């Protein structure tokens, strides 16, 4: 990937976010250890992160998000998940860095360019589980439905991850994705991050370069986690990223004061709230 200083497209956000994982991993009191993150991010990822950091984008939301997803993954594996599908997997290295069962099937789905880049960087590394990669534009609904059916048919209990994905989708696209996942009976859980309309508005202002790169932040439902209930998914775990970051001792004094406020659980549209939610299939 060539080196320039600004975000060009949505795939560049993976380089940017990997730097935050690298920075956390290099701390003496690191919450997690992603030893592959800096290599995956490369020089370009560092440039993008430095540019955005100058606009006061703190590290802690990404640390809290990563930690929360890790927790949901571990919980679901303990409960019997045998397959994980990571949609728009980007530069996530969990199959390499997490303690996972060797029998676990992990499927990463992303655009061909992203997968080719990632495979080249990690070519000499061995995953800790059964890792597969699928080159697919997730906007192709028929193809993704076929993929879900193929994977779901071979699984007893599947967890789907959409980390840093649905905020870029329209409301209609999120509805369609929720429907496509629900069709597969073996898909029991879905982990995703979610923004309130209040947070979405703030991020749109602070990260305007995303819109300039044709990667605008779009989705922040007024219903909060309840948005998914009519679509067959119930929020069984809600992790407020501010409060998680506070528990992990990653907040400045300024943010610690806000962390003391009551948690809206994403149900107050005007509140600046960001979280990670575990959605569990509502059996009909």
Task: Identify the meaning behind each predicted range.
Residues 1-85, 89-136, 141-148, 154:
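Rossmann-like AdoMet
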Residues 143-144, 168-184:
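A short, conserved alpha-helix within the catalytic core of class I
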Residues 157-172:
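A short SAM/SAH-binding and catalytic strip from SAM-dependent methyltransferases
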Residues 159, 184-197:
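Conserved beta-strand signature within the Rossmann-like core of class I S-adenosyl-L-methionine
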Residues 197-215:
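Short, glycine-/aromatic-enriched active-site segment of Class I SAM-dependent methyltransferases
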Residues 215-240:
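Short alpha-helix
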Residues 236-260:
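Conserved catalytic loop of SAM-dependent methyltransferase domains
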Residues 271-284:
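C-terminal lobe and adjacent flexible extensions of AdoMet/dcAdoMet transferase-like proteins
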């Amino acid at each position: 990937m060539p080196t320039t200083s600004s975000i060009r497209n949505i795939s560049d956000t993976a380089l940017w976010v990997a730097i935050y994982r690298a920075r956390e991993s290099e701390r003496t009191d690191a919450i997690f250890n992603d030893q592959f993150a800096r290599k995956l991010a490369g020089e370009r990822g560092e440039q993008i992160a430095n540019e955005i950091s100058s606009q006061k984008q703190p590290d802690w939301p990404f640390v809290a998000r990563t930690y929360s997803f890790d927790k949901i993954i571990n919980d679901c594996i303990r409960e019997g998940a045998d397959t994980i599908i990571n949609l728009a997997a980007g530069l996530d290295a969990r199959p390499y860095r997490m303690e996972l069962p060797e029998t676990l099937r992990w499927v990463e789905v992303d655009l061909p360019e992203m997968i080719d880049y990632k495979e080249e960087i990690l070519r000499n590394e061995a995953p800790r589980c059964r890792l597969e990669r699928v080159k697919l534009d997730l906007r192709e609904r028929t193809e993704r439905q076929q993929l879900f059916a193929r994977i779901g048919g071979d699984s007893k209990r599947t967890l789907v991850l959409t980390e840093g994905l649905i905020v870029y989708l329209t409301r209609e696209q999120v509805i369609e994705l929720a429907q496509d996942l629900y069709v597969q009976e073996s898909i029991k859980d879905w982990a995703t991050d979610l923004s309130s309309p209040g947070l979405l508005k703030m991020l749109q202002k602070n990260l305007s370069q995303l819109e300039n790169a044709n990667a605008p932040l779009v989705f922040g439902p007024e219903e909060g986690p309840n948005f998914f209930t009519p679509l067959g998914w119930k929020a069984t775990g809600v992790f407020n990223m501010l409060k998680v970051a506070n528990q992990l001792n990653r907040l400045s004094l300024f943010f610690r004061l806000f962390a003391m406020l009551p948690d809206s659980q994403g149900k107050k549209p005007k509140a600046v709230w960001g979280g990670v939610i575990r959605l569990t299939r509502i059996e009909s």
